[in-house]
Amino acid sequence: MTKSYNYKLTHFVTSAPDIRHLPVDSGIEIAFAGRSNAGKSSALNTLTNQKSLARTSKTPGRTRLINLFEVESGIRLVDLPGYGYAEVPEELKRKWQRALGEYLQMRDSLKGLVVLMDIRHPMKDLDQQMVQWAVDVNIPVLVLLTKADKLASGSRKEQLNQVREAALAFMGDVQVETFSSLKKQGVDKLRQKLDDWFAAIPPAQGSPETE
């Protein structure tokens, strides 16, 4: 039976401008990625039932660092810099994108990717690039269509079906679900997927086994 992790115990570990400043590359990391207004921080706060675990901001693109959170020893969640921001100097934008790309390509402990998209504007070019990259390197993806409370039930189901249909083109392990931090919708499915991903890989050597 898959272990259920207590995400309420998640705590902040460190922020890093690039992978060279991250802790040792061991254990299991699940990363959260998305456009700068997709609701990443809100989703992490909802998942962990903590109001301010991840800083939320009215200003898109405030997540400028790779932020690591630990659920328990060797089990981590990662909040990646938002992409697709407009109100940012070009040089800084390139710096963030380089840090994001390095993490995705070189971090061995990365074992799953949650890509968050506003349900009203899903599958933008950068979103598709993010999913395609993960599929290319055999990393499973969970697409969360955030702010689902902004659409009526019928429109929500229609959008979900359209994105699921579009996801088939990636020909990889890509699951699509709706999510609302406000209504707590989709939280159980997110937790279940994280539990499954964390269970798929044995803990890092030296980590205490927990039943």
Swiss-Prot record:
Coiled coil: none annotated. GO terms for molecular function: GTP binding; metal ion binding. Mg(2+) binds at S41, T63. GTP binds at residues 34-41, 61-65, 79-82, 146-149, 179-181. Pfam families: MMR_HSR1. InterPro entries: G_ENGB_dom, GTP-bd, GTP-bd_ribosome_bio_YsxC, P-loop_NTPase. One of its GO terms (cellular component) is cytosol. GO terms for biological process: division septum assembly. Its cofactor is Mg(2+). Keywords: Cell cycle, Cell division, GTP-binding, Magnesium, Metal-binding, Nucleotide-binding, Septation. Residues 26-200 form the EngB-type G domain. The keyword Lipid biosynthesis does not apply. The keyword GTP-binding applies. Belongs to the TRAFAC class TrmE-Era-EngA-EngB-Septin-like GTPase superfamily. EngB GTPase family. Necessary for normal cell division and for the maintenance of normal septation. NCBIfam families: GTPase_YsxC. This is Probable GTP-binding protein EngB. It comes from Sodalis glossinidius (strain morsitans). The gene is engB.
